[in-house]
Amino acid sequence: MKKQAIGFIDSGVGGLTVVKEAMRQLPNESIYYVGDTARCPYGPRPEDQVRKFTWEMTHFLLDKNIKMLVIACNTATAAALKDIKKKLAIPVIGVILPGSRAAIKATHTNRIGVIGTEGTVKSNQYKKMIHSKDTKALVTSLACPKFVPLVESNEYSSAIAKKVVAETLRPLKNEGLDTLILGCTHYPLLRPIIQNTLGDSVTLIDSGAETVSEVSTILDYFNLAVDSQNKEKAERNFYTTGSSQMFHAIASEWLQLDDLAVEHITLG
Protein backbone atom coordinates (compact mmCIF):
# COMPACT_ATOMS: atom_id res chain seq x y z
CA MET A 1 0.00 0.00 0.00
CA LYS A 2 2.80 2.45 0.89
CA LYS A 3 4.30 2.29 -2.61
CA GLN A 4 1.00 3.07 -4.34
CA ALA A 5 0.62 6.52 -5.86
CA ILE A 6 -1.25 9.56 -4.60
CA GLY A 7 -3.92 10.67 -7.10
CA PHE A 8 -4.48 14.33 -7.97
CA ILE A 9 -7.42 15.61 -10.03
CA ASP A 10 -8.22 19.04 -11.47
CA SER A 11 -10.25 20.71 -14.20
CA GLY A 12 -7.02 21.38 -16.11
CA VAL A 13 -3.42 22.37 -15.38
CA GLY A 14 -4.16 24.27 -12.15
CA GLY A 15 -3.62 21.26 -9.91
CA LEU A 16 -0.01 21.15 -11.10
CA THR A 17 0.63 23.93 -8.56
CA VAL A 18 -0.34 21.37 -5.89
CA VAL A 19 1.78 18.65 -7.54
CA LYS A 20 4.79 20.98 -7.57
CA GLU A 21 4.44 21.42 -3.83
CA ALA A 22 3.93 17.65 -3.37
CA MET A 23 7.15 16.96 -5.30
CA ARG A 24 8.97 19.38 -2.98
CA GLN A 25 7.48 18.21 0.33
CA LEU A 26 7.04 14.51 -0.54
CA PRO A 27 9.78 13.67 -3.08
CA ASN A 28 9.54 9.89 -2.54
CA GLU A 29 5.82 9.68 -3.27
CA SER A 30 4.56 8.55 -6.68
CA ILE A 31 1.98 10.82 -8.33
CA TYR A 32 -0.84 10.19 -10.80
CA TYR A 33 -2.46 13.37 -12.11
CA VAL A 34 -5.58 13.86 -14.22
CA GLY A 35 -6.38 17.26 -15.76
CA ASP A 36 -9.79 17.46 -17.46
CA THR A 37 -8.58 20.16 -19.84
CA ALA A 38 -11.13 19.33 -22.55
CA ARG A 39 -14.00 20.37 -20.26
CA CYS A 40 -12.20 23.20 -18.46
CA PRO A 41 -13.19 25.61 -16.95
CA TYR A 42 -15.45 24.02 -14.33
CA GLY A 43 -16.33 27.37 -12.71
CA PRO A 44 -19.37 28.29 -14.86
CA ARG A 45 -20.77 24.74 -14.94
CA PRO A 46 -23.73 23.50 -12.84
CA GLU A 47 -22.73 21.82 -9.58
CA ASP A 48 -24.18 18.41 -10.50
CA GLN A 49 -22.19 18.39 -13.75
CA VAL A 50 -18.97 19.28 -11.90
CA ARG A 51 -19.70 16.44 -9.45
CA LYS A 52 -20.19 14.01 -12.36
CA PHE A 53 -16.91 15.05 -14.03
CA THR A 54 -15.07 14.81 -10.69
CA TRP A 55 -16.35 11.26 -10.18
CA GLU A 56 -15.19 10.30 -13.70
CA MET A 57 -11.64 11.43 -12.92
CA THR A 58 -11.82 9.70 -9.53
CA HIS A 59 -12.88 6.36 -11.07
CA PHE A 60 -10.05 6.62 -13.61
CA LEU A 61 -7.51 6.94 -10.79
CA LEU A 62 -9.14 4.29 -8.60
CA ASP A 63 -8.46 1.87 -11.47
CA LYS A 64 -4.78 2.81 -11.05
CA ASN A 65 -4.98 1.63 -7.43
CA ILE A 66 -4.12 4.95 -5.74
CA LYS A 67 -3.71 5.06 -1.94
CA MET A 68 -5.07 8.60 -1.46
CA LEU A 69 -7.00 11.17 -3.52
CA VAL A 70 -6.34 14.92 -3.59
CA ILE A 71 -9.09 16.98 -5.23
CA ALA A 72 -6.69 19.70 -6.40
CA CYS A 73 -9.48 21.93 -7.69
CA ASN A 74 -11.53 24.33 -5.57
CA THR A 75 -14.66 24.11 -7.75
CA ALA A 76 -14.59 20.30 -7.63
CA THR A 77 -13.87 20.36 -3.88
CA ALA A 78 -16.93 22.56 -3.30
CA ALA A 79 -19.15 20.36 -5.48
CA ALA A 80 -17.97 16.82 -4.78
CA LEU A 81 -15.62 16.40 -1.78
CA LYS A 82 -18.33 15.49 0.72
CA ASP A 83 -19.85 12.86 -1.58
CA ILE A 84 -16.54 11.29 -2.63
CA LYS A 85 -15.13 11.26 0.91
CA LYS A 86 -18.23 9.44 2.14
CA LYS A 87 -18.04 6.74 -0.55
CA LEU A 88 -14.31 5.94 -0.79
CA ALA A 89 -12.32 3.71 1.55
CA ILE A 90 -9.07 5.64 0.95
CA PRO A 91 -8.28 9.09 2.43
CA VAL A 92 -9.65 12.00 0.35
CA ILE A 93 -8.73 15.65 0.81
CA GLY A 94 -9.82 18.88 -0.88
CA VAL A 95 -8.20 22.32 -0.99
CA ILE A 96 -10.75 24.55 0.78
CA LEU A 97 -10.24 23.64 4.46
CA PRO A 98 -6.41 23.91 4.41
CA GLY A 99 -6.59 27.29 2.62
CA SER A 100 -9.15 28.61 5.12
CA ARG A 101 -7.05 27.54 8.11
CA ALA A 102 -3.93 29.18 6.70
CA ALA A 103 -5.77 32.46 6.04
CA ILE A 104 -7.10 32.63 9.62
CA LYS A 105 -3.56 32.06 10.89
CA ALA A 106 -2.08 34.72 8.58
CA THR A 107 -4.52 37.63 9.03
CA HIS A 108 -3.85 40.40 11.57
CA THR A 109 -6.92 42.50 10.77
CA ASN A 110 -9.51 39.72 10.27
CA ARG A 111 -10.16 41.06 6.76
CA ILE A 112 -9.78 38.11 4.39
CA GLY A 113 -10.39 38.07 0.65
CA VAL A 114 -11.17 35.03 -1.49
CA ILE A 115 -10.78 34.90 -5.26
CA GLY A 116 -11.99 31.90 -7.23
CA THR A 117 -14.16 30.64 -10.06
CA GLU A 118 -17.87 31.45 -10.23
CA GLY A 119 -18.65 27.97 -8.90
CA THR A 120 -16.36 28.27 -5.88
CA VAL A 121 -17.52 31.78 -4.97
CA LYS A 122 -21.20 30.88 -5.45
CA SER A 123 -20.81 27.82 -3.19
CA ASN A 124 -19.76 30.13 -0.31
CA GLN A 125 -17.61 27.27 1.02
CA TYR A 126 -14.64 29.45 1.98
CA LYS A 127 -16.81 31.94 3.86
CA LYS A 128 -18.61 29.12 5.72
CA MET A 129 -15.35 27.35 6.53
CA ILE A 130 -13.65 30.53 7.77
CA HIS A 131 -16.65 31.55 9.89
CA SER A 132 -16.83 28.07 11.42
CA LYS A 133 -13.29 28.64 12.73
CA ASP A 134 -13.41 32.41 13.37
CA THR A 135 -16.75 34.23 13.61
CA LYS A 136 -15.06 37.66 13.73
CA ALA A 137 -13.49 37.36 10.27
CA LEU A 138 -14.82 39.61 7.50
CA VAL A 139 -14.70 37.71 4.23
CA THR A 140 -14.91 39.38 0.81
CA SER A 141 -15.27 37.06 -2.19
CA LEU A 142 -14.69 37.84 -5.86
CA ALA A 143 -15.19 35.59 -8.89
CA CYS A 144 -12.40 35.89 -11.49
CA PRO A 145 -13.74 33.99 -14.54
CA LYS A 146 -11.00 35.21 -16.89
CA PHE A 147 -8.08 33.86 -14.85
CA VAL A 148 -8.35 30.12 -15.65
CA PRO A 149 -8.45 30.66 -19.46
CA LEU A 150 -5.28 32.80 -19.16
CA VAL A 151 -3.44 29.93 -17.47
CA GLU A 152 -4.83 27.18 -19.70
CA SER A 153 -3.73 29.10 -22.82
CA ASN A 154 -0.21 29.57 -21.38
CA GLU A 155 -0.66 33.35 -21.16
CA TYR A 156 -0.11 33.60 -17.41
CA SER A 157 2.93 35.90 -17.56
CA SER A 158 1.89 37.98 -20.58
CA ALA A 159 1.00 41.68 -20.86
CA ILE A 160 -2.63 40.58 -21.41
CA ALA A 161 -2.54 38.75 -18.06
CA LYS A 162 -1.30 41.89 -16.26
CA LYS A 163 -4.14 43.95 -17.75
CA VAL A 164 -6.84 41.34 -16.99
CA VAL A 165 -5.64 40.80 -13.40
CA ALA A 166 -5.46 44.55 -12.68
CA GLU A 167 -8.98 45.14 -14.03
CA THR A 168 -10.50 42.09 -12.32
CA LEU A 169 -9.02 42.79 -8.87
CA ARG A 170 -9.86 46.50 -8.85
CA PRO A 171 -12.95 45.97 -6.60
CA LEU A 172 -10.68 44.51 -3.87
CA LYS A 173 -8.27 47.44 -3.73
CA ASN A 174 -10.37 49.46 -1.25
CA GLU A 175 -11.54 46.56 0.92
CA GLY A 176 -8.68 46.88 3.41
CA LEU A 177 -7.72 43.21 3.04
CA ASP A 178 -4.49 41.99 4.60
CA THR A 179 -4.89 38.36 3.43
CA LEU A 180 -6.12 36.92 0.13
CA ILE A 181 -6.85 33.25 -0.54
CA LEU A 182 -5.98 32.12 -4.06
CA GLY A 183 -9.13 29.99 -4.15
CA CYS A 184 -8.34 28.24 -7.42
CA THR A 185 -5.30 26.06 -8.00
CA HIS A 186 -4.69 27.79 -11.35
CA TYR A 187 -4.09 31.14 -9.63
CA PRO A 188 -0.59 30.55 -8.17
CA LEU A 189 0.70 30.70 -11.75
CA LEU A 190 -0.57 34.31 -11.74
CA ARG A 191 0.80 34.97 -8.24
CA PRO A 192 3.54 37.52 -9.16
CA ILE A 193 1.01 39.61 -11.10
CA ILE A 194 -1.64 39.33 -8.35
CA GLN A 195 0.91 40.34 -5.68
CA ASN A 196 2.09 43.26 -7.78
CA THR A 197 -1.50 44.42 -8.32
CA LEU A 198 -2.52 44.30 -4.65
CA GLY A 199 0.83 45.26 -3.10
CA ASP A 200 3.12 43.61 -0.56
CA SER A 201 0.86 44.46 2.39
CA VAL A 202 -1.52 41.67 1.28
CA THR A 203 -0.47 38.10 2.19
CA LEU A 204 -1.40 35.60 -0.52
CA ILE A 205 -2.51 32.14 0.61
CA ASP A 206 -1.90 29.28 -1.81
CA SER A 207 -4.59 26.75 -0.85
CA GLY A 208 -2.80 24.01 -2.80
CA ALA A 209 0.50 24.38 -0.96
CA GLU A 210 -1.34 24.31 2.37
CA THR A 211 -3.14 21.15 1.27
CA VAL A 212 0.11 19.23 0.71
CA SER A 213 1.12 19.83 4.34
CA GLU A 214 -2.13 18.12 5.35
CA VAL A 215 -1.51 15.30 2.84
CA SER A 216 1.80 14.64 4.58
CA THR A 217 0.09 14.51 7.99
CA ILE A 218 -2.60 12.13 6.71
CA LEU A 219 -0.04 9.78 5.11
CA ASP A 220 1.83 9.56 8.40
CA TYR A 221 -1.36 9.11 10.43
CA PHE A 222 -2.56 6.18 8.29
CA ASN A 223 0.97 4.78 7.94
CA LEU A 224 0.79 5.22 4.14
CA ALA A 225 3.95 7.27 3.56
CA VAL A 226 6.73 5.72 1.49
CA ASP A 227 9.64 4.66 3.72
CA SER A 228 12.43 7.25 3.63
CA GLN A 229 14.93 4.41 2.99
CA ASN A 230 13.05 3.44 -0.19
CA LYS A 231 15.46 3.78 -3.11
CA GLU A 232 12.93 3.22 -5.89
CA LYS A 233 12.36 6.24 -8.12
CA ALA A 234 8.96 7.86 -7.58
CA GLU A 235 6.61 7.59 -10.58
CA ARG A 236 5.09 10.72 -12.14
CA ASN A 237 2.22 9.98 -14.52
CA PHE A 238 0.15 12.73 -16.12
CA TYR A 239 -3.14 12.36 -18.02
CA THR A 240 -5.18 15.00 -19.83
CA THR A 241 -8.47 14.96 -21.71
CA GLY A 242 -7.32 17.91 -23.84
CA SER A 243 -4.22 18.71 -25.88
CA SER A 244 -1.28 16.71 -24.55
CA GLN A 245 1.12 19.15 -26.29
CA MET A 246 -0.32 22.21 -24.52
CA PHE A 247 -0.45 20.34 -21.21
CA HIS A 248 3.16 19.23 -21.67
CA ALA A 249 4.32 22.78 -22.45
CA ILE A 250 2.81 24.20 -19.25
CA ALA A 251 3.64 21.21 -17.03
CA SER A 252 7.29 20.86 -18.06
CA GLU A 253 7.89 24.59 -17.50
CA TRP A 254 6.05 24.75 -14.18
CA LEU A 255 7.36 21.46 -12.73
CA GLN A 256 10.85 21.71 -14.26
CA LEU A 257 10.73 18.07 -15.40
CA ASP A 258 12.72 17.05 -18.48
CA ASP A 259 11.30 13.53 -18.78
CA LEU A 260 7.64 14.45 -18.38
CA ALA A 261 5.26 12.14 -20.26
CA VAL A 262 1.64 13.13 -20.83
CA GLU A 263 -1.03 10.68 -21.98
CA HIS A 264 -4.28 11.74 -23.63
CA ILE A 265 -7.39 10.07 -22.19
CA THR A 266 -11.15 10.24 -22.77
CA LEU A 267 -13.58 10.38 -19.85
CA GLY A 268 -17.35 10.03 -19.73
Curated annotation (Swiss-Prot):
The record's EC number reads 5.1.1.3
Q: Which UniProt keywords apply?
A: Cell shape, Cell wall biogenesis/degradation, Isomerase, Peptidoglycan synthesis
Catalytic residues of the enzyme: 73 (proton donor/acceptor), 184 (proton donor/acceptor)
Give me the residues that bind substrate, please.
Answer: 10-11, 42-43, 74-75, 185-186
Q: Which GO terms describe its molecular function?
A: glutamate racemase activity
A GO BP annotation: cell wall organization
Look up the record and name the pathway of this protein. Answer: Cell wall biogenesis; peptidoglycan biosynthesis
Matches recorded under Pfam families:
Asp_Glu_race (PF01177)
Query: InterPro entries given for it?
Result: Asp/Glu/hydantoin_racemase (IPR015942), Asp/Glu_race (IPR001920), Asp/Glu_racemase_AS_1 (IPR018187), Asp/Glu_racemase_AS_2 (IPR033134), Glu_race (IPR004391)
Q: Which reaction does it catalyse?
A: L-glutamate = D-glutamate
- List the NCBIfam families hit by this protein, alphabetically: glut_race, PRK00865.1-3
Its family remark reads:
Belongs to the aspartate/glutamate racemases family.
Q: What is its biological role?
A: Provides the (R)-glutamate required for cell wall biosynthesis.
Name of the featured protein: Glutamate racemase
The encoding gene is murI
